[in-house]
Amino acid sequence: MDVIKKKHWWQSDQLKWSVIGLLGLLVGYLVVLMYVQGEYLFAIMTLILSSAGLYIFANRKTYAWRYVYPGLAGMGLFVLFPLVCTIAIAFTNYSSTNQLTFERAQQVLMDRSYQAGKTYNFGLYPTGDEWQLALTDGETGKHYLSDAFSFGGEQKLQLKETDALPGGERANLRIITQNRLALNQITAVLPDESKVIMSSLRQFSGTRPLYTLADDGLLTNNQSGVKYRPNNDSGYYQSINADGSWGDEKLSPGYTVTIGAKNFTRVFTDEGIQKPFFAIFVWTVVFSVLTVVLTVAVGMVLACLVQWEALKGKAIYRVLLILPYAVPSFISILIFKGLFNQSFGEINMMLSALFGIKPAWFSDPNTARAMVIIVNTWLGYPYMMILCMGLLKAIPDDLYEASAMDGAGPFQNFFKITLPLLIKPLTPLMIASFAFNFNNFVLIQLLTNGGPDRLGTTTPAGYTDLLVSYTYRIAFEGGGGQDFGLAAAIATLIFLLVGALAIVNLKATRMKFD
């Protein structure tokens, strides 16, 4: 006898396909909206991920993929997609001065205007809940008055000549300032059909478009007569000389263009970028290597000590030594920043009392780097200590008993037995720690902000800057503008360098993953 399983209403196929259909419509709407807004990469990414997700969760044959899809989607969205965007930006001139599309930059220039013709003093006079606009010609003394109107939106006011201004009290400067946005949307039309708009808090004046666009793309300044053409190599409207060559003047804002590998070329050819880049790269490698070596050394030694059988109160020592790992790193970094203060820090007070010295932790390059390594070692050793404590449990006690019979001491046991047996399983974690510290942005940003600064560079760079913080400063702290394209190029190089170093380290260790 066949048993018929009763389905609940939420298990029905109609409900499932209805939900899938609604999700599909919502995704389609979002994709179209992104496409209309010009966000093509986001539209493509959303379409791919959502289509794959709907197919996998709607098809019974792809049931196993339902467990894999969230991880793959997360990796694609948060790893691959930003990587592709960064590499794409690296081949453009995208910056704080070249953010717009060509059409948008052209429209911004065409919207600019300049004062032309007469200037009129204006006043606002209340008429109940409405206002009247009055203009006065300073040269002839003639007055012009509008009908009553209310603020709101763009509007044209037809003004008529009048012998005298209204008798009410004229609006003061505070009221005009409060309604400035509304007044900027008013166009006053005089009896001779000339138009004037608000040019200051007390004046209306005639305006003309600053630029005129020809059919061939030539832009002419109506005030100075200078002509401009779009230069697709630099991403600006640039002046042209009488012989047709490019002039020196560029119109801002610029627009984004593809410039090929120029950003990468700048890194290796521009001395103002090249010198700090290679110096910062060397320091980044040294910092990462020293951090890994010191954290492993300190963590391993402390792990051996707290595992020592003769030591009393081991649990208390373990808790105390792991505490730096429990405190959020940004809090510890800011505390150390205060402790290392050159004038009032406790560390300098102690060194001055004991040895009569006050190191310049934040102004001298060498001591600043030493401080960074000290703080990072403090932050990183608890992690390595926890790992070593676990790995020490896997070492057989028979090895130490045999070495004791041969007369070996603690140091011989450590270097002949403990270290060789711990270093191999630690190697992948050491490589991961190296990669993490290679991009340890939080430490540098909060502790030194990259300082002390280097002199004679065209980009902001400091002696404690890592490549990642150097990239950040180029992108967001550049005095000559935020150069996102150059920062993206350096970020791409960092990705390649970290990947190459990780591969070299793995091959150098000749590890076998069985």
From Swiss-Prot:
| Cellular location(s) | Cell inner membrane
Q: Which residues does the entry place in the Periplasmic compartment?
A: 37-39, 93-283, 342-369, 436-483
The primary location reported for this protein is: membrane
Q: Which Pfam families match?
A: BPD_transp_1, MalF_N_TM, MalF_P2
Q: Which GO terms describe its cellular component?
A: maltose transport complex
What does the sequence similarity comment in the record state about its family?
A: Belongs to the binding-protein-dependent transport system permease family. MalFG subfamily.
According to UniProt, the name of this protein is Maltose/maltodextrin transport system permease protein MalF
The encoding gene is malF
